[in-house]
């Protein structure tokens, strides 16, 4: 009898195991990591774009320049002024109004997203694109330019093309923009990389990182594929947008005469830029005419320009005017830095280079901090700390993770120097 009961239990256990195996097989099939069939799931705007029914300016329409793009009403209450200036501040408030029921292609300006990526970045980049489209670009259908030092493959082009609601364009970086200039001693550069590896300096050992920083500093804006645009928004893989942007952010930049905008700022690793400031001072001494009146020298230097405090705008999020990078002042500044060799003999990043240039060559009123966007790039978060702002912008971020008012952030200094009013409740997020 005991043997019969044991056999029965074994049979029941065997049946149960078969059921579990079957369920596991079904779940595995349902959660396959194979790429989705974008041809079947792409948006109508993307489909029309791929079939040639979208106007040259991008967006969903009948193909005429004045085609209308239907848009829904802004959701939730509207903050009166998210970026209002405090006493003495000169910054214009970001308008928080309903988008019209229709938004014509003629309302758009000459602007594009710009992404530097490799084919291997595809699916981490796809998440970034989804964030930007859902939070902003599905309303405005701006173009997206992708740059690579190698050819993009068909999978990359087809996948991003199905996600972007505007036109997608792909540019191959010229060899001379992604290689050593003739005056660089490559043996010396290799020795520096090895020394930085031993010191465990972040990206200090990387050759490709240096080419990337030099490219973003001096060549991305020279790409012929960008000649048709006046403004850009830099987007990288693995970023997140946490809040709705219900106004045309490019048009706002133009209408308010802004040339550079950021969401996060912090000090640079001093070990990567030991001579960057001295090299900058050499340039300024020879070219004082390029210093802007009412510049932000006091943001990048605590001693009236003697030394650099390391503060820089985090360049993985940039919205800016391409005219600034194309200007004589910036071109000559980059050429001076490039000849000095610090991109390879040290590890100069594009973020401090861009930031120093913007701080010195632009009036401070042309630089803007977007505190209503909600942005993440590992490991830092920008999240509006004012609860009413988060509700109005439909943000899904945790204000306790906001970096803006922390002691290590340079944005607090930016607010203080400009005498800007801070967000309601900021004091609770400083620790």
Curated annotation (Swiss-Prot):
Gene3D superfamilies: Spore Coat Polysaccharide Biosynthesis Protein SpsA, Chain A (3.90.550.10)
Membrane-crossing residue ranges in chain numbering: 10-28
Topology feature Cytoplasmic, residues: 1-9
Compositional bias (Polar residues): 35-44
Main subcellular localisation: Golgi
Record-level GO BP terms: cell adhesion involved in multi-species biofilm formation; cell wall mannoprotein biosynthetic process; cell-cell adhesion; cell-matrix adhesion; mannoprotein biosynthetic process; N-glycan processing; protein N-linked glycosylation; protein O-linked glycosylation
Gly residues bias (residue ranges): 55-64
Pfam family, one: Glyco_transf_15
Lumenal-facing ranges: 29-431
GO molecular function per UniProt: alpha-1,2-mannosyltransferase activity
E.C. number: 2.4.1.-
Record region (Disordered): 35-73
Pathway the protein acts in: Protein modification; protein glycosylation
Record's GO cellular component terms: extracellular region; Golgi apparatus; Golgi membrane; membrane; plasma membrane
Top-tier EC class: transferase
UniProt function note: Involved in O-glycosylation of cell wall and secreted proteins. Transfers an alpha-D-mannosyl residue from GDP-mannose into lipid-linked oligosaccharide, forming an alpha-(1->2)-D-mannosyl-D-mannose linkage. Mainly responsible for the addition of the second mannose residue in an O-linked mannose pentamer. Can also substitute for MNT2 by adding the third mannose residue. Important for adherence to host surfaces and for virulence.
Family under the similarity heading: Belongs to the glycosyltransferase 15 family.
Protein name per the record: Glycolipid 2-alpha-mannosyltransferase 1
The species this protein was found in: Candida albicans (strain SC5314 / ATCC MYA-2876) (Yeast)
Taxonomic lineage of the native organism: Eukaryota, Fungi, Dikarya, Ascomycota, Saccharomycotina
């Amino acid at each position: 009898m005991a043997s019969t009961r044991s056999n029965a239990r074994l049979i029941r256990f065997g049946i149960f195991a078969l059921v579990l195996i079957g369920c596991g097989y079904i779940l595995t099939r349902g959660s396959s990591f194979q790429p989705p069939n974008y041809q079947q799931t792409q948006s109508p705007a993307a489909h029309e774009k791929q079939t040639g029914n979208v106007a040259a300016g991008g967006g969903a329409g009948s193909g005429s320049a004045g085609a209308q793009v239907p848009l829904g009403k802004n959701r939730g209450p509207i903050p009166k002024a998210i970026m209002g200036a405090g006493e003495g501040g000169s910054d214009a408030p970001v308008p928080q109004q309903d988008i019209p029921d229709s938004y014509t292609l003629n309302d758009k300006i000459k602007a594009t997203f710009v992404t530097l990526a490799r084919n291997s970045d595809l699916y981490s980049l796809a998440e970034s694109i989804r964030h930007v489209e859902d939070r902003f670009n599905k309303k405005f259908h701006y173009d997206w330019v992708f740059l690579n030092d190698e050819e993009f493959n068909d999978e990359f082009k087809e996948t991003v093309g199905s996600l972007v609601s505007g036109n997608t364009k792909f540019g191959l970086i010229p060899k001379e923009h992604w290689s050593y200039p003739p005056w660089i001693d490559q043996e010396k550069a290799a020795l520096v990389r090895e020394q930085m590896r031993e010191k465990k300096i972040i990206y200090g050992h990387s050759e490709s990182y240096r080419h990337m920083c030099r490219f973003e500093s001096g060549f991305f804006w020279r790409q012929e594929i960008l000649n048709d645009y006046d403004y850009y928004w830099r987007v990288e893989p693995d970023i997140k947008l946490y809040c709705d942007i219900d106004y045309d952010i490019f048009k706002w930049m133009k209408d308010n005469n802004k040339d550079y905008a950021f969401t996060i700022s912090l000090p640079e690793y001093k070990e990567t830029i030991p001579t960057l400031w001295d090299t900058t001072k050499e340039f300024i001494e020879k070219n004082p005419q390029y210093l802007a009146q009412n510049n932000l020298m006091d943001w990048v230097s605590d001693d009236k320009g003697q030394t650099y405090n390391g503060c820089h705008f985090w360049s993985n999020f940039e919205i800016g005017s391409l005219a600034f990078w194309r200007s004589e002042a910036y071109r000559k500044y980059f050429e001076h830095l490039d000849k000095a060799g610090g991109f390879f003999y040290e590890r100069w990043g594009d973020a401090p280079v861009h930031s120093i240039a913007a701080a010195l060559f632009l009036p401070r009123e042309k630089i803007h901090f977007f505190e209503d966007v909600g942005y993440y790039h590992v490991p830092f978060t920008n999240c509006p700390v004012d609860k009413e702002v988060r509700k109005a912008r439909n943000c899904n971020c945790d204000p306790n993770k906001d970096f803006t008012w922390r002691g290590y952030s340079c944005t607090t200094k930016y607010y203080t120097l400009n005498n800007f009013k801070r967000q309601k409740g900021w004091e609770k997020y400083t620790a």
